[in-house]
Amino acid sequence: MAPSQLPAIFNPTSQDIEQLLAAQCHLGAKNLQVHMEPYLWKTRPDGINVINIGKTWEKIVLAARIIAAIDNPADICVISARPYGQRAVLKFAAHTGAVAIAGRFTPGNFTNYITRSFKEPRLIIVTDPRTDAQAIKEASYVNIPVIALCDTDSPTEFVDVAIPTNNKGRHSIGLVWWMLAREVLRLRGSIASREAEWDTMVDLYFYRDPEAEENKEAIEEAKAPGADEVGAAAVDQGFAGAGDWEVSGATAGAFTAASNTAAAGGASWDAAEPSDWAAAPAAAGQEWAASGTEQW
């Protein structure tokens, strides 16, 4: 990391540098835009361009000072058409008071005053100059300054402040937006001192896949009781109703005895029926025979 050109109070801590490296903010693309060459540290043997983390931090502080200089936070517009940055811009807007455009940028937002979504911001911040090219183009028409998260292959035309970082990873995008929001709040005085920790976790700025969250909830609901525990005791505890089944088995024996009694009752009916019915037809036969002979 090159020596910092900032005042000592703005120097990053070792934890800040570790977070930038852990989120892979220093890993750029294989292509290199000529205007991004000053932010390049070196090129790896596999062709990946490595970004100078010191330059990244300097540009984060510079962008935060520009944002804090605007009196009305609602005059700042943060934009992200890239899905990995949509959650980050919404959180940034919630914490700093800016206006967020997450998702598709409607053409004419800055130039067509007839539309309902017409805006006149004093500053815009975009996640990727390539995916947010329409917003940058319209900002150039109406002289709006642009701050952008730029990778080594990002076009820098009409970009006033480029923050060199990896703008394709979910963690790198979320971390840079989180650091930018924290620095803005520090300059505004919302955070008491630079030594004080911000109570907002960086995880809130990371992208989350809705389908993955739904699948995770479905898996947790489908788990059997005791499946998370280890050992035979957990399984026995999970199927604690086995004793109830044994009791019901005893009850089933009572039902078996009752069915045997019913079967015995059926046998007595069978025994009674042949004697009664066999005797009755015989008697009837004798009466008919007797009456017939008497008449004849």
UniProtKB/Swiss-Prot annotation:
PROSITE patterns: RIBOSOMAL_S2_2 (PS00963). Residues 267-296 are annotated as: Disordered. One of its GO terms (biological process) is translation. Its main location: cytoplasm. Keywords: Cytoplasm, Ribonucleoprotein, Ribosomal protein. The keyword Ribosomal protein applies. Gene3D superfamilies: Glucose-6-phosphate isomerase like protein, domain 1. Pfam families: 40S_SA_C, Ribosomal_S2. It comes from the Eukaryota. The keyword Cytoplasm applies. It is found in: Cytoplasm. Component of the small ribosomal subunit. Mature ribosomes consist of a small (40S) and a large (60S) subunit. The 40S subunit contains about 33 different proteins and 1 molecule of RNA (18S). The 60S subunit contains about 49 different proteins and 3 molecules of RNA (25S, 5.8S and 5S). Interacts with rps21. This is Small ribosomal subunit protein uS2. It comes from Botryotinia fuckeliana (strain B05.10) (Noble rot fungus).
